[in-house]
Amino acid sequence: EYLKVLGMGCGLFNQDVLGTAMGFWLSSPTSEDVRPIGQRIPDENQTLWLFTTDATPSTHRMTVGTRVSGLERGQYRFVYQDSGLVNRRWDEVVSGDVYCVALQRQTSFHTFDEVSRAALLVEVGPDGMAMTVEAIAGGKCDGQDFSFSGAEQIFYR
C-alpha cells in the first residue's frame, strides 16, 4: 500500500502471504542461512516468485529460474478462477490440496502465449513454510485428481 501513497501503479513488491503459495520461494530453508539479511543474495535461478500486478488484475504471475525441471526460465501467467483446484489465485492456494495451474509463458515484454505451455502442480506444506511443485511440460490441468509423479521439487520461505 505504500506504493499507492507514492503514486506508483505497479503494486506492492513484498507479496508474501503466509500460509499460501503467494510470495517469494527459495531452494533451501532460510533458517539454514544465518548471515545478516543484507548479505543474503539468492541465486535467481534457484527461486520461484508467485505474485500479482495492478496492471493485470485478473491474472496472477510466476517468475522462475532454471531449478524447476520442465519449465524454461522466465515469467508465466494464468487467468485465475474463484473456485476449485485449477488456476486459483496464489493467495488462495493453501495447505491440504494439490492444485494445478495452466501456465502461459511470456514471449516479449508485453505478450504471453495464448495457450498454456505447461501445467504446474502446487502443494503448500502444513505450516506454510514449504511448497512442493512439479512442472509438466505441455501438460494441462485436466480432471480434479492431481498427484506428483516423483519429479517434484520443494521450495521454502
Where are these regions (language model features)?
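Acidic, glycine-rich catalytic/binding loops that coordinate metals and/or anionic ligands
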Residues: E1-E44, A55
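Beta-sheet ligand-binding and adhesion/scaffold domains
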Residues: F13, Q81-R157
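Short, hydrophobic/aromatic-rich segments at coil-to-beta transitions
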Residues: G19-F24, S58-R61, V94-V101
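N-terminal glycine/threonine-rich, aromatic-flanked beta-hairpin/loop signature
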Residues: D33-V86
